[in-house]
Amino acid sequence: MMKANELREKSAQQLNEQLLGLLRDQFNLRMQKATGQLGQSHLLSQVKRDIARVKTVLNQQAGK
């Protein structure tokens, strides 16, 4: 889990790279869930929230 304050210290390029990684993680978790291999279902919502945090910080930085 990431803190929004930690994310605000990163550049937009770093945030975009992190966002891509999180989206890949989310896709892999969804595929594991679909095939019945996902043992830790809480990871889906955790990654979803992390994606939202990164997008929020990116939008805040774009507005400045």
Swiss-Prot record:
CDD domains linked to this entry: Ribosomal_L29_HIP (cd00427)
Classification via InterPro entries: Ribosomal_protein_uL29, Ribosomal_uL29, Ribosomal_uL29_CS, Ribosomal_uL29_sf
HAMAP family associated with the record: Ribosomal_uL29
Organism: Pseudomonas putida (strain ATCC 47054 / DSM 6125 / CFBP 8728 / NCIMB 11950 / KT2440)
Record family assignment: Belongs to the universal ribosomal protein uL29 family.
Sample GO molecular function, one term: structural constituent of ribosome
High-level lineage: Bacteria, Pseudomonadati, Pseudomonadota, Gammaproteobacteria, Pseudomonadales
GO BP: translation
Protein name (Swiss-Prot/TrEMBL): Large ribosomal subunit protein uL29
Matching Pfam families: Ribosomal_L29 (PF00831)
